[in-house]
């Protein structure tokens, strides 16, 4: 059943996903080869209607699922009971803080940080993402500020040696680009393919970002 669900997700077939989980809600508990539950697979898909229905059908949420689904009170309850969970990777390799960031759960991210979550902790899967990478991917400026205040390494790399600045430049988000540079992001770091944040902005024609980075590079 999990393989059928995965096929529907790959093909972005929301109606078939919803029909599948309505008929077989137990698939939400099943785990794929990467360690993701059916619920998490749907969450990662970005298919909002299917995700909303999955949350309605799910009866019990583990710690990481509670974060992804924005269940603040349940996350808090887990932390009060098991403090060490704040830095425990999910079965598919992501940190609690990175999951909170990726799903724009800023209040949950704040709760995790207040309870000892390490902002620099990377995923154990091939993505190697940390919370800042996820926050930049979602263009969540406030969370980026919060992570920086909590000492995150702005130059940490994920897969292909991508930094948060590379990601922000790719998105053309000048506000986050400035925030990162003002807090120590190195402009000339290269990805595996040789691109810098400046060259990315130039290629994608994000003129304001390019002009800002080019000026900073020449100082």
Regions found by a protein language model. Give the residues of each.
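Ankyrin-repeat inter-repeat connecting loop/turn
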Residues: 27-28, 85-86, 119-121, 154, ...
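Ankyrin-repeat-protein effector appendages
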Residues: 1-7, 51-66, 150, 183, ...
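Ankyrin repeat boundary/linker residues
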Residues: 31-32, 89-90, 123-125, 158, ...
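Alpha-helical adaptor scaffolds
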Residues: 122-125, 129-149, 155
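N-terminal segments that cap or nucleate solenoid repeat domains
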Residues: 1-33, 70-92
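Start-of-repeat signature of ankyrin repeats
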Residues: 35, 59, 93, 127-128, ...
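Ankyrin repeat A-helix N-terminal signature
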Residues: 7-12, 41-47, 65-71, 99-105, ...
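Ankyrin repeat structural motif
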Residues: 14-21, 47-54, 71-79, 105-113, ...
């Amino acid at each position: 059943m999990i393989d059928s669900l995965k096929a529907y997700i790959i093909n972005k077939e929301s109606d078939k996903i919803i029909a599948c989980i309505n008929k077989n809600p137990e698939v939400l508990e099943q785990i794929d080869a990467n360690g993701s539950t059916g619920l998490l697979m749907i969450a990662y898909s970005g298919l909002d209607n299917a995700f909303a229905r999955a949350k309605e059908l799910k009866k019990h949420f583990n710690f990481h699922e509670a974060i992804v689904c924005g269940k603040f009170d349940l996350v808090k309850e887990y932390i009060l009971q098991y403090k060490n969970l704040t830095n425990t990777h999910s079965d598919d390799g992501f940190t609690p803080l990175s999951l909170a960031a990726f799903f724009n759960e800023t209040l949950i991210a704040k709760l995790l940080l207040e309870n000892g979550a390490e902002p620099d902790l990377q995923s154990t899967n091939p993505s190697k993402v940390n919370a800042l990478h996820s926050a930049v991917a979602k263009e969540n400026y406030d969370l980026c500020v919060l992570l920086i205040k909590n000492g995150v390494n702005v130059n940490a790399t994920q897969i292909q040696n991508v930094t948060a600045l590379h990601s922000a430049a790719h998105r053309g988000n000048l506000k986050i680009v400035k925030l990162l540079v003002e807090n120590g992001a190195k402009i000339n770091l290269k990805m595996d393919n040789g691109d810098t944040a400046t060259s990315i902005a130039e290629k994608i024609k994000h003129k304001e970002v390019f002009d800002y980075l080019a000026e900073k590079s020449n100082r």
